């Protein structure tokens, strides 16, 4: 949405500090000097439509069960589901020294999902001053994402922001991907009278 070198943020950083926002007639001003021409970033911020909508659902569910004394089973389920839609429309603009001769419109949609499932089985015990803990576990997760975008120029009206109606050459992009992992692990800890400690972990 920042539009790289032609975005509002970049133009704002490059605008000289004494540049006026409006001219004497109350219109948006553009400063043209020798070796320097930059559009009015305030004008672009007010005239361009840049919208980003996001939806997100995330959470974590867990429970502990103690079937026997000193033995605990813990299960965790986590998830994250998100989607977003970015709409960008730039109308034709004439700021005197700077012009945008063609309008342009772009839409991008993104979605992603993530889930994680864990199980732990832990046993705590002791014999006199010898304390020990044994744990075995399993973990699995998966992540997926996809996106589509379309961009075009030369729309017939500023009222309808639909790239499919543009007379220019449309630019269409899409992509997707996924990753996953499954692992098992164990951990042993030993404590003698709070004087000697030892831990062993394997995944």
Name each region found by the language model.
Residues 1-56, 74-183:
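Surface-exposed loop/interface segments of Gram-negative outer-membrane beta-barrel transport/assembly proteins
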Residues 61, 123, 185-187:
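Generic recognition of flexible, low-complexity loop/linker segments
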Residues 62, 66, 72-76, 131-135, ...:
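Membrane-spanning beta-strand positions in outer-membrane beta-barrel proteins
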Residues 66-68, 126-128, 193:
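Outer-membrane beta-barrel channels and translocator barrels
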Residues 75, 117, 182-188, 192, ...:
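Extended, hydrophobic alpha-helical segments in both membrane/secreted and soluble proteins
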